[in-house]
Every structure is written in C-alpha cells, then in structure tokens.
Design a protein with these regions (language model features):
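Nucleotide/pyrophosphate-binding catalytic subdomain
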Residues: 1-237
Length: 237
C-alpha cells in the first residue's frame, strides 16, 4: 500500500457535499469496523515520507472510531549485508528515536478537530521474545534475530485499556539480549497471533502490476500467488 498524497482541493463529483449525507454514507463502515483489530505495518519508506504526519493523524482518527490498533514500525530495511557491531548499535539508536517520534506525533491528537490535544494513550513494551539468527554459511549474524514468542495477552490488555499498541521491530531474549527483527515477519506473527481482522502495510512500494503494467487495486490470496508466479516466469524468459 502506498502512502496517500495530499487530498485534492475539489472533492470528487460523487462525494456527498452535505455533511449529513456524508455521515449517513460512512456510518455503516464505522459501525462495521468498530471493535475490530487492525495491525498497521509502517515500512521504512513510510516513516520517512513527508506525508507521514497525516498518516499518524489518520491512525489516530481510526482509533477514535473504535478500531483497536497495533502499529509496527520498521526502523530500517534488513539487507543481505552482514551487520557489524557499530551498525547494530546505530540501528538500535535509530529504532528508539523513531519510536519516540511516532509517540510524539500521536500525542498531538487530531489537529483542527474536537480531539485536538486529546490524550491518546500509546503503549510500547517488551512484547516480543526473540532468538538469534545465529551462524549462516560460517558468518555470525550478530544482532539479527527471529521472533520466538509474542505476548498476546499483554497486547490485548493494552488494547482493552483503549491504548494504541506501538511495536518496534526489536526483540529481547530470555537472557536479556537485544535483537533487530524483520518487520514483515513481526507483522505476520502479530496478525496471526492476535487473530487480526486486517493487516495493512504502508510503504513506498508501488504495488503489484499485471502483464500490461496496470496496478492491481484488489487481490485475493490465490490471485496474488498467481501474479507472483507469472512475474517470476517473465523474469526467467
């Protein structure tokens, strides 16, 4: 899912201009999603985007409408390069700084609305137990880890307390070691463990296109698998 751009000045022709009509049209969707659990994954490109502050405001609005939000942020993409000790320390510092910035933006409430300066509770914690990746092809992966366990009860307790749960792609081992994790894997395990109703991933990736270069607006799981197979076959030709 790509980041939204600033809204156009003129509303679409089919958008109701009467506030009452607009509310009547949106009320069924608000009612349908109230109380649902949604995991929102923020890839590195999303958090660095100029429009990110508007994304946070949209998430705050979703929360105010009764959606239980778990926000996972990726502090940096994991590449194939071996992580050095200096790079690991820098990665941890970046992750903690990014978490602080996201908490700061949520603390603003919803600007230009009755919820401006309203207190939105954001909860972070040691929700993820991790284990080391270990040695691959004779190379020690140092601070890279894998998800071992998710504290589902702790996250549910935060959500039931009307908090937004903010999860950094870091994990701790029972021995107190700290590991950096694959954010996509964290999103997947969280969504499955919580039985989330939706998983939304926001990034700077443009999406999946068909053979003619047209963007798929909607895909079932089977259609997505077929699209990936077709893409792989085309690359081999």
């Amino acid at each position: 899912m790509t980041l939204p751009t600033d809204p156009p000045t003129d509303p679409p022709a089919d958008l109701p201009t009467d506030p009452i009509d607009w509310f009547r049209n949106t009320a069924p969707y608000i009612n349908a999603h109230r109380g649902t659990t949604v995991v929102v994954g923020l890839r590195h490109g999303a958090t660095e985007h100029d429009n990110f502050i508007n994304v946070v405001h949209d998430l705050a609005l979703m929360h105010s409408l009764g959606v239980q939000l778990i926000v996972v942020h990726e502090h940096e993409p994991l590449d194939a390069a071996v992580m050095t000790s200096d790079a690991f320390r820098s990665s941890i510092a970046h992750a903690l700084d990014q978490r602080t910035q996201i908490e700061r933006l949520f603390s603003m409430g919803l600007p230009n609305s009755p919820l401006h300066n309203a207190r939105l509770r954001v909860v972070s914690g040691n929700f993820i137990t991790a284990r080391p990746v270990g040695v691959i092809d004779g190379v020690d992966q140092l601070g890279r880890g894998l998800v071992r366990h998710i504290d589902v009860a702790g996250i549910r307790h935060a959500l039931e307390g009307s908090a937004i749960c903010l999860v950094t792609s870091l994990g701790h081992s029972p021995a107190g070691e700290l590991f950096t994790l694959d954010a996509i894997e964290v999103m997947r395990v969280l969504s499955r463990g919580l039985g989330a109703d939706k998983l939304i991933v926001m990034s700077d990736f443009d999406g999946i296109e068909d053979a003619d270069g047209q963007l798929f607006r909607q895909l079932t799981v089977d259609a997505a698998r077929n699209a990936l197979v077709t893409s792989a076959q085309q690359q081999q030709q």
